[in-house]
């Protein structure tokens, strides 16, 4: 009988609990024991582990956040810290590890695998910034949260004939801004992958105003710069009445969508099956609605391809 360790690491994402549930229940179904590790790699080094059972994951599929909590851990980034982690895992007779998180979490799983400890990664991040998978757990829910906010902001924007800048998460990847902006009917979408000047944005505002449209929504990915700075510069160039909304951590919360719950469930079960097959240093993901797995190193080496077609479509539809 295998014993599986399970942790969530990095930024939380809606659907992580659904993945936790899937790992625990499928592992027990296959006759395994599961230890939940609280607060990620930090909790592992502090031996904050709890054996999980079926009731541990009851009534959590609909909950946002992660019942295992999450944190970041500088000590784990050191060789000494990782050796300590392996020693603790062996102390609890844990045979393998499932890590739910993003690229940093996967890098940690790779390091453990390099030390001979089997680990599998499940993609959980709202940014959707992992190139090897079409979607990450939490992305769909975060998009829906943003779209809901854009709709409400548009109501007041149109009432007062204002330009509203909505800042969303996405340091290096503009997927949240792009797809939420497209689905929310934003007049301008600003992402890290496409260079656009303040003058160009101001010209778009002036053009729409000349057509008689007195309000606009600009969706800005945080990785491009701050919404407040953009507001000041646009005010100078366009003279428009502007307001800023920074959605912040509200994007990470909320009950996961159907898509995220199903994705998390499928990935969780597949991760357990890989471990039972003796696989290690791999991540699971989804491509064209099929569950895939590949080496962590290969997954992290892939470069995210920006959806230029969707971006151009958004420009066409925002005239």
From Swiss-Prot:
Mg(2+) binds at residue 103. Pathway: Carbohydrate degradation; glycolysis; D-glyceraldehyde 3-phosphate and glycerone phosphate from D-glucose: step 3/4. Its EC number is 2.7.1.11. Allosterically activated by ADP and other diphosphonucleosides, and allosterically inhibited by phosphoenolpyruvate. It catalyses: beta-D-fructose 6-phosphate + ATP = beta-D-fructose 1,6-bisphosphate + ADP + H(+). Substrate binds at residues 125-127, 162, 169-171, 222, 243, 249-252. ADP binds at residues 21-25, 154, 185-187, 211, 213-215. It is found in: Cytoplasm. NCBIfam families: PFKA_ATP (TIGR02482), PRK03202.1 (NF002872). Belongs to the phosphofructokinase type A (PFKA) family. ATP-dependent PFK group I subfamily. Prokaryotic clade 'B1' sub-subfamily. This is ATP-dependent 6-phosphofructokinase. It comes from Clostridioides difficile (strain 630).
């Amino acid at each position: 009988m295998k014993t599986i360790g399970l942790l969530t690491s990095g930024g939380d994402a809606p659907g992580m609990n659904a993945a936790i549930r899937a790992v625990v229940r499928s592992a027990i179904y296959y006759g395994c024991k599961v230890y939940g590790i609280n607060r990620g790699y930090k909790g592992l080094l502090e031996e904050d582990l709890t054996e999980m059972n079926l009731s541990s994951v009851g009534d959590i599929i609909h909950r946002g956040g992660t019942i295992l909590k999450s944190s970041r851990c500088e000590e784990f980034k050191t060789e000494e810290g990782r050796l300590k982690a392996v020693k603790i895992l062996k102390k609890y007779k844990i045979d393998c590890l499932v890590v739910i998180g993003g690229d940093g979490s996967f890098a940690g799983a790779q390091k453990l695998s390099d030390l001979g400890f089997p680990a599998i990664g499940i993609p959980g991040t709202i940014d959707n910034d992992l190139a090897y998978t079409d979607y990450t757990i939490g992305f769909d829910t975060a998009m829906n949260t943003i779209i809901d906010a854009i709709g409400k902001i548009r109501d007041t924007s149109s009432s007062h004939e204002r330009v509203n800048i909505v800042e969303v998460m996405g340091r290096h990847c503009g997927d949240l801004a792009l797809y939420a902006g497209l689905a929310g009917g934003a007049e301008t979408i600003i992402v890290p992958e496409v260079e656009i000047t303040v003058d160009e944005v101001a010209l778009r505002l002036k053009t729409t105003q000349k057509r008689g449209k007195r309000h606009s929504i600009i969706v800005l990915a945080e990785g491009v710069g701050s919404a407040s700075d953009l507001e000041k510069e646009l005010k100078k160039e366009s003279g428009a009445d502007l307001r800023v909304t920074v959605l912040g951590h509200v994007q990470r919360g909320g009950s996961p969508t159907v898509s995220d719950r199903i994705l998390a469930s499928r990935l969780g079960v597949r991760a357990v099956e890989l471990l039972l097959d003796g696989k290690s240093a791999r991540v699971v993901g989804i491509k064209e609605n099929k569950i895939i797995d590949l080496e962590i190193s290969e997954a992290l080496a892939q470069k995210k391809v920006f959806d230029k077609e969707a971006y151009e479509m958004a420009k066409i539809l925002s005239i």
